[in-house]
């Protein structure tokens, strides 16, 4: 049975309905934008999840092309033809469990030197490792964070899960801006890269199927 694919509009470019969908996903259901308490609540909610877009590569691996804070965690997969779909909670948990087993036995490319190989075909990251290398991995896979936190190979490989240095930097900036300044835990450590090596939230919010995103 074929899984349904949905084209996800660029909310940053397309106005109207896309903007309304964005508002609903970050949990701002009120039209009273001038209330300080509501703004404070919104600021806190975006730290609970991440919206991540993974793009399939020619070698069938996956790269993070965009991610930013969201009230709930959404993972969108874009195939080579540009079709996009949102992974279900069950799919995500299955992928994380499979990758955890690889981490335990040392076969995960996240913990191998130089991404587990050179530039040969198939040396890229699969869906599970791409998820755990993203911001969503720090949230959904927080329970295995200790297995990765001090791993120097992970610290390097997590950056390689991004399609470009610019995509990685945009993510860092986006999550740093959304972090609470008073806690002293809002920005990633300059000495570490990757999301298990930063001060990302470690709560595990429910995964929700979203219907919007934007092209990198």
Swiss-Prot record:
<comment type="similarity">
    <text>Belongs to the UPF0323 family.</text>
</comment>
<keyword id="KW-0472">Membrane</keyword>
<keyword id="KW-0564">Palmitate</keyword>
<dbReference type="InterPro" id="IPR020913">
    <property type="entry name" value="UPF0323"/>
</dbReference>
<feature type="compositionally biased region" description="Low complexity">
    <location>
        <begin position="198"/>
        <end position="209"/>
    </location>
</feature>
<keyword id="KW-1003">Cell membrane</keyword>
<feature type="region of interest" description="Disordered">
    <location>
        <begin position="159"/>
        <end position="216"/>
    </location>
</feature>
<keyword id="KW-0449">Lipoprotein</keyword>
<dbReference type="GO" id="GO:0005886">
    <property type="term" value="C:plasma membrane"/>
</dbReference>
<keyword id="KW-0732">Signal</keyword>
<protein>
    <recommendedName>
        <fullName>UPF0323 lipoprotein HPAG1_0235</fullName>
    </recommendedName>
</protein>
<feature type="compositionally biased region" description="Polar residues">
    <location>
        <begin position="159"/>
        <end position="196"/>
    </location>
</feature>
<feature type="lipid moiety-binding region" description="S-diacylglycerol cysteine">
    <location>
        <position position="28"/>
    </location>
</feature>
<feature type="lipid moiety-binding region" description="N-palmitoyl cysteine">
    <location>
        <position position="28"/>
    </location>
</feature>
<feature type="signal peptide">
    <location>
        <begin position="1"/>
        <end position="27"/>
    </location>
</feature>
